A protein has these predicted regions:
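Juxta-kinase regulatory segment immediately upstream of eukaryotic protein kinase catalytic domains
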Residues: 1-27
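Histidine (H) residue identity feature
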Residues: 4-8, 15, 104, 136, ...
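Conserved ATP-binding subdomain of kinase catalytic cores across diverse folds
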Residues: 17-119, 143-147
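Flexible, glycine- and charge-enriched loops at secondary-structure boundaries
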Residues: 64-71, 127-135
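AlphaC helix of the protein kinase catalytic domain
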Residues: 118-127
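Conserved kinase catalytic-core segment
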Residues: 129-151
């Protein structure tokens, strides 16, 4: 198991290393399909864990030898965004699990930010004015990515 923890979150190492056992209380589950996204509380802080399910065999080989895992890339992109002044959830850690020498499962952990979900702008739970503001913020964010040559 490869565990990379941002030095700022070293105090949470025991919680982070226990994530693959999934023996923690989930505060909220946002997505539970191919990948799982859930909010958890470790100590005094809320975090988001994204678990990347086992990829197809060819991708297991690619992530083992040729390409960084999605978890590692998510961590590195979050660091890059913050360095470029693009607001995003601070990256906390990533975990890569190998079985029989091959990549199997990845986890990306970030701080939880209490913002509305992008998917909320398509549902009926928000007032129309709030949906409009969220769509505007999404366009501004995308523009910021372009101006910083990220997209």
């Amino acid at each position: 198991m490869k565990v990379h923890i941002h030095p700022h979150y070293a105090a949470y190492e025991s919680y982070i290393r226990a994530i693959p056992s999934e023996e923690y209380e989930r505060e909220e589950v946002y997505c539970n399909r191919r990948n799982t996204v859930e909010r958890v509380r470790f100590g005094d802080k809320d975090f988001v864990i994204k678990k990347y399910k086992r990829p197809a065999l060819i991708n297991c080989l690619i992530y083992t030898w040729f390409r960084k895992s999605k978890a590692q890339r998510a961590f590195e992109y979050a660091e890059l965004f913050l360095q470029q002044g693009i607001e995003t959830a601070p990256p906390v850690a990533y975990i890569e699990i190998k079985k029989n020498g091959f990549f199997h499962t990845g986890y990306f952990i970030s701080e939880y930010l209490p913002y509305p979900l992008v998917t909320d702008m398509f549902g009926t739970e928000m007032e129309e004015e709030e949906k409009k503001r969220l769509r505007h913020d999404l366009v501004d964010f995308t523009l910021q990515l372009h101006l910083n040559k990220v997209l």
